[in-house]
């Protein structure tokens, strides 16, 4: 019995020590890690009569049961914990969440992080929204806003979520915009005007921020359903590729994802082609050598080995939850992306 108590005591000590150590690391750390992930249809198992969620019910086409929901939560948590060298992200944008409750279930999985949820319901017909979760020991909440996107088809689409956070190390204000632009359903060319509309709407909002403060710190993240060299990104937003060693005189938006695209990498496998549709874009004020700074070459597509499909048509791609209506039991049909930032000097 004493041996059992001793073993239990050791396990408890290790649990407390690990949690304390991570907290201490963050307290003395001038960096923060930002991630973005389309988590592929995180629905609960209850019917929402106001949305088209019938496929994701126990009796629906996908036979979405409580066991499958809980398995999905565990898989998502495994990938999120893997990020940032096993410490998890300090802030992460999540796409394709049905409601705030499914995010609450997800963050219960993280015992060594104190995540807070920023979320608003959107008018998307399927009921999927964008959300942001952040560690309250690293960031404080300033404001949450939504940006309505009106597209040419007139079909209600997802809001862009604008979350203003304060980095607690020096009280710097950072604007996070979580995007899930209209899909390519019907074909890339035919659906492009919808994403152009989203880009124009976002750009109008950003211009107001820059008018108020040309040094506004801005991080755009999400699933844009367009690539870095598509018109909506490169022309409307003006988010360009850049040389990490010579950006002090750059103005506007810098696309951290661009080089990955030119290297043939991607976050989403469409047929046999990689698409870099999950992106992180920053204002040039985060690469000017002052205060908060993007750490050069820290952007990456996050591809843990356990998440990579080993066979079939999706070989080397992300292992999804579903392939059509066939249950796979994986993680998501998108790989996450992430990048790291550092506070060069405290105010």
Across the structure, where does each feature detected by a protein language model lie?
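Active-site beta-strand/loop signature of hydrolases that rely on acidic residues for catalysis
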Residues: 34-39, 64, 69-72, 76-103, ...
